[in-house]
């Protein structure tokens, strides 16, 4: 069965964005882009909340065409345009979307159907509200976290309204030159 992997940049104190959604504190660079690029190339499905999906759609489809496109822009744009996208939204309609499916109801059933389909693991990109919903229904299988060397003090938390303990098994860690630490956790359902 396919796994849902939550891919998220977080602050040391567990926030994924500032109080107004700002993400200008996230550290990136070629080292992280290359590492992430290799891993996402192994996936064939991306999962987004509506807000993150719309943000991605505003940039990635044509990012490679810009005269100032970086290596990362070109590679990620190519991946984004070929990957199958699933969007969690109660307000969007999928009538004219290409290579994209909208899940608007029966979240647990629809996600479990998706996980049963043939294919590679499914990456949930950012999307804090969608992540909260999936966590609350015990649908996330792994956490791929990039802990940034900053304490925000307030903002949008990664973990919100958790009803019980979620046991995790640490799979790997990696430290990047910019100070970011990658943590890979598997949800331990035993």
Task: Indicate residue ranges for each PLM-predicted region.
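Enzymes that bind and transform nitrogen-containing heteroaromatic metabolites
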Residues: 1-190
């Amino acid at each position: 069965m396919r796994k849902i992997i939550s891919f998220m940049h977080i602050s040391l104190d567990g926030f994924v964005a500032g109080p107004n959604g700002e993400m200008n504190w996230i550290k990136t660079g070629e080292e992280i882009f290359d590492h992430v690029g290799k891993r996402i190339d192994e996936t064939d499905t991306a999962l987004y909340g509506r807000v993150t999906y719309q943000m991605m759609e505003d940039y990635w489809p044509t990012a490679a065409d810009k005269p100032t496109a970086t290596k990362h822009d070109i590679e990620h744009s190519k991946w984004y345009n070929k990957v199958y996208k699933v969007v969690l939204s109660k307000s969007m309609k999928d009538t004219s979307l290409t290579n994209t499916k909208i899940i608007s109801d029966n979240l647990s059933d629809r996600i479990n159907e998706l996980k049963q389909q043939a294919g590679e693991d499914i990456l949930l990109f950012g999307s804090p509200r969608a992540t909260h919903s999936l966590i609350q229904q015990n649908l996330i299988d792994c956490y791929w976290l990039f802990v940034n060397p900053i304490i925000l003090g307030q903002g949008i938390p990664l973990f919100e309204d958790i009803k019980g303990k979620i046991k995790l098994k640490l799979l790997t860690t990696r430290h990047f030159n910019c100070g970011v630490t990658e943590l890979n956790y598997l949800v331990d359902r035993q």
